Structures are given as C-alpha cells and as structure tokens.
Amino acid sequence: MKFFVDTADTQDIADLAATGLIDGVTTNPSLIAKSGRPFAEVIAEICALTDGPVSAEVVAIDFDGMMREGRKLAKIADNVTVKLPLTLEGLKACKALTSDGIDVNVTLCFSANQALLAAKAGATFISPFIGRLDDIHIDGMELIQEIRQIYDNYMFETEILAASIRSPNHVRLCALAGADVMTAPPAVIRSLVSHPLTDKGLETFLADAKKAGIEV
C-alpha cells in the first residue's frame, strides 16, 4: 500500500520525504489556506519535494470552471493530480481531463456506487472518506472492501486512495481491506512507528550496551 501525506506544510513534507516512506501528497483548499501563501506557489513547492503524485483541488463546481482550473493546475508540474468533487459535473470533467492525459483524483466519495461512477469516468484515484463515515456510524472499512471487490470484478485501473485517516488503526484496516493508497496527516504517519515494547526494548539494549562499555 502506498503512503501519501495529507498536508500543505512543506516542512512536514520534506521531513517525511527524507524517510523514503512517502509516495505522494494530497492537499485541499482548506489545508493550503492555512499556509497563507498563494495556491500555485504552494503546489509548485510541494511538487518539487516529491516525485510522486500531488493532488491539487479545484474550487469551481461547474464543468467549464473545473476544466479551466484543472488544466491550469496540471501546468504547474508534471506530477500534479487534479482533484475533483464527486458530482455529475465533476465526473464529466474527470472524463474530459483524463482523456487529455491528466491524472484525476475524485474526492468526497462515500458510497460504492459513487466509486463505480468515478472508475467509469476514468479516475486515476478515488478517495473514500473513512473518518467522516465513522462520524455518522457507518463502517468506512466496509466501503473500502466493497470498492475493492467491484474494481477487481471489472478490472478497473482506478486506485483506491483511502482518505480521512485519523489513526494507526485506520491505516492497518485499510491495508487489510485492500486499499491501494492511504493518505494521512503527518502526525498519524509518524505515530505508525511507535510501540511501547519497541521503546522498552531499545531502552534495555542501550542500558546493557552502556553497562558493558560497548562501542561501535
């Protein structure tokens, strides 16, 4: 499973990219607004920090506006993936942009039917929102499993990009359910490495090495 980081903080992206564990980045207008910087400037800087896909979202909701903004975003860098909302206008724009060779991430997916439509529209990625489904007491992981089965049944190439990831347990369950990609905030990705027994074991090893005077 590929790991994308969900942030517009370029320092966080640079730090995580240096680990070699990050395969791409997802952003949205809300995340970029927090930076207080011009939209295109932030996207360009992020694209320079990773070779992987960088999702940049349109703010238009009509077909012509999405096409205009999508083409503008795609010109920022070769690794930009245009992020579109899961609406009929968004799916129409998805079909048109992907036909032109532009990668598209269809976002705000909350049902298997929506995911099926996105795949038929040629989406590069579909982003089901796990945490937001949990908020309304619907099992987001069941949705991942349903999408996985449908895509496998019909050999769709659209990748399942699990979003709204809020905990290490979400990451584990997405991997078990067959998500191709998960995107999570930097804090969640960093928390994946932690385990109390790892910390305890390391503490013991270091104490024993110091006691024995071991140097490498």
From Swiss-Prot:
It is found in: Cytoplasm. It is an enzyme of class 2 (transferase). InterPro entries: Aldolase_TIM, TAL/FSA, Transaldolase_3B, Transaldolase_3B/F6P_aldolase, Transaldolase_AS, TSA/FSA_arc/bac. GO terms for molecular function: aldehyde-lyase activity; transaldolase activity. One of its GO terms (biological process) is carbohydrate metabolic process. Its EC number is 2.2.1.2. Keywords: Cytoplasm, Pentose shunt, Schiff base, Transferase. Pathway: Carbohydrate degradation; pentose phosphate pathway; D-glyceraldehyde 3-phosphate and beta-D-fructose 6-phosphate from D-ribose 5-phosphate and D-xylulose 5-phosphate (non-oxidative stage): step 2/3. It catalyses: D-sedoheptulose 7-phosphate + D-glyceraldehyde 3-phosphate = D-erythrose 4-phosphate + beta-D-fructose 6-phosphate. PROSITE patterns: TRANSALDOLASE_1 (PS01054), TRANSALDOLASE_2 (PS00958). It comes from the Bacteria. GO terms for cellular component: cytoplasm. The keyword Nucleotide-binding does not apply. The active site is at residue 83. The keyword Transferase applies. NCBIfam families: fsa_talC_mipB. PANTHER family: FRUCTOSE-6-PHOSPHATE ALDOLASE 1-RELATED, TRANSALDOLASE. Belongs to the transaldolase family. Type 3B subfamily. Transaldolase is important for the balance of metabolites in the pentose-phosphate pathway. This is Probable transaldolase. The lineage of its organism: Bacteria, Pseudomonadati, Pseudomonadota, Alphaproteobacteria, Hyphomonadales.
